[in-house]
C-alpha cells in the first residue's frame, strides 16, 4: 500500500490536549474502505506549564475534567502585588482543578500584598509563602486544609498584621492551623 495512492490519512484535533481523530480512507481499488480511530492527547504528569505568569505542575493528566495541577510559582515574583489562585485553570482548552500550592512556590515574593486561595486547594507546601514580608491579606476559599496537608513554615515571615478571611465553619481551626504554620 502506498500513501496518497491507495489511501489518505486525515487528522482532526491532533495538536491540542483532548481527543484526536485519525481517519484512513481507501483510494482506487481500496475505495469505500474507511477506518477511524480516536486517541487522547494529554500533558505528561510533572509537566510544567505557565498560564498568565503562574507556573503549574501537572499532578493528574486526565482530560475528562478530572485533571489536576499544583501551583509551582510565578514568573513575576519580584513585582507581583496580588495573586488569585482560582478553582481551575484552562490549559490547551482543557480545565484542570488547582489542588495544591508547591513548597516555596511564592517564597521571597517581597511585594506580594494579597492572595486568594481557591476552593479546590487541599495542600499547601512547606514555606509556600515564606518571607512574603508585604503579605497583608489572605483569602482562603477552601475548607480542605489540615495540619497534615499544610507544610511547615508555609506562612512564616509574612506581615505580622496579615489578616486571613476563611470559611465561617473553619474560623477556629484555621486560626490555630495558620498560627502553627508561621502566621
Map each language-model feature to its residues.
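Serine/threonine-rich, repeat-prone extracellular segments and beta-strand-based repeat modules
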Residues: 2-32
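Secondary-structure transition/turn motif
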Residues: 25-29, 68-79
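Edge beta-strands of extracellular beta-sandwich domains
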Residues: 33-40
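Structural signature of tandem-repeat unit edges
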Residues: 39, 62, 78-100, 109-123, ...
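Extracellular interdomain linker/stem segments of modular secreted and single-pass surface proteins
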Residues: 41-47
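GGW-centered surface loops in extracellular recognition modules
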Residues: 50-75, 178
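Consensus positions within tandem repeat domains that build extended binding/scaffold surfaces
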Residues: 103-105, 125-128, 151-154
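Short, aromatic/basic amphipathic alpha-helical patches
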Residues: 151-155, 172-183
Amino acid at each position: 500500500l502506498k500513501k496518497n495512492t491507495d489511501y489518505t490519512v486525515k487528522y482532526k484535533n491532533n495538536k491540542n490536549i483532548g481527543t484526536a481523530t485519525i481517519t484512513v480512507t481507501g483510494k482506487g481499488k481500496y475505495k469505500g474502505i474507511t477506518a477511524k480511530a480516536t486517541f487522547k492527547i494529554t500533558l505528561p504528569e510533572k509537566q510544567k506549564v505557565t498560564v498568565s505568569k503562574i507556573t503549574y505542575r501537572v499532578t493528574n493528566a486526565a482530560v475528562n475534567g478530572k485533571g489536576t495541577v499544583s501551583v509551582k510559582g510565578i514568573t513575576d515574583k519580584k513585582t507581583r502585588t496580588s495573586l488569585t489562585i482560582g478553582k481551575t485553570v484552562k490549559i490547551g482548552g482543557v480545565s484542570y482543578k488547582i489542588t495544591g500550592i508547591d513548597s516555596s512556590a511564592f517564597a521571597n515574593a517581597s511585594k506580594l500584598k494579597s492572595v486568594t486561595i481557591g476552593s479546590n486547594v487541599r495542600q499547601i507546601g512547606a514555606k509556600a509563602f515564606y518571607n512574603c514580608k508585604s503579605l497583608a491579606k489572605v483569602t482562603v476559599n477552601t475548607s480542605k486544609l489540615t495540619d497534615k496537608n499544610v507544610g511547615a513554615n508555609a506562612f512564616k515571615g509574612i506581615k505580622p498584621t496579615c489578616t486571613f478571611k476563611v470559611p465561617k465553619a473553619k474560623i477556629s481551626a484555621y486560626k490555630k492551623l495558620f498560627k502553627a504554620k508561621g502566621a
